[in-house]
Design a protein with these regions (language model features):
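Ligand-binding pocket segment of bilobal, Venus flytrap-like solute-binding proteins
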Residues: 1-53
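Soluble non-cytosolic domains of exported or imported proteins
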Residues: 13-17, 71-76, 88, 129-137
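Sec-exported extracytoplasmic/periplasmic mature domains
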Residues: 6-10, 24, 28, 73, ...
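Residue-level detector of short coil/turn "hinge" positions at structural boundaries
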Residues: 9, 30, 49, 101-102, ...
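Extracytoplasmic/secreted proteins, especially bacterial periplasmic and envelope-associated proteins
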Residues: 4, 18, 22, 27, ...
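Mature extracytoplasmic/periplasmic domains
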Residues: 59-60, 64, 69-126, 159-160
């Protein structure tokens, strides 16, 4: 499937917002990416030529992270920041600042615009994060090897922006 699909792929980007930006600017007609990135292009950048299509089988998701570095100069201040960053008071500011993801913080208010575009926190595919973490290198190598075997120039850094 991916080898056949490759014939229609302009660029593989590691940028989550890249596909929706490319559609918005007219560089391509279809982009596969995260829905919240598409919403950002529509709401914040005014690209009214983007239509979001949500698979009935569920959407993918990403997990943001925050951390305190070992040996941080001010670990107590860092702990206070993380407590605030994970509070409803902070995450409720997300949509006001161009972040339209569904929130996972208890008692946080979901961005209204996300629901208006059809995002549904109950419509998320069953995703095995442990398997993906453990096997990502293998899965990427399998796809890249299959593409190379089909004749795709996987060394083309303009098309395969994955490093």
């Amino acid at each position: 499937y991916l080898v056949d699909l490759d014939k229609n792929i302009q660029v593989y980007t590691k940028s989550g917002s890249g596909p929706s930006k490319n559609v918005g600017t007219g560089e391509c007609v279809i982009g596969i990416g995260f829905l919240h990135d598409g919403i950002t292009q529509i709401i914040d950048n005014g690209y009214d030529n983007i239509e979001l299509i949500i698979p009935s089988s569920g959407t993918s998701c990403e997990i943001g992270a925050t951390a305190i570095f070992k040996g941080a100069a001010h670990p107590n201040a860092a702990k206070l920041w993380i407590e605030y960053a994970l509070s409803p008071d902070c995450v409720n500011l997300a949509a006001q600042n161009g972040s339209y993801q569904f929130l996972v913080i208890d008692n946080a208010t979901q961005p209204e615009v996300a629901a208006e575009f059809g995002l549904d926190p109950e419509n998320v595919m069953d995703y095995d994060f442990d398997d993906a973490t453990k096997n990502i290198k293998t899965y990427v190598e399998e796809v890249m090897n299959a593409l190379a075997a089909s004749g795709a120039n996987t060394g083309d850094e303009n098309r395969f922006q994955v490093k």
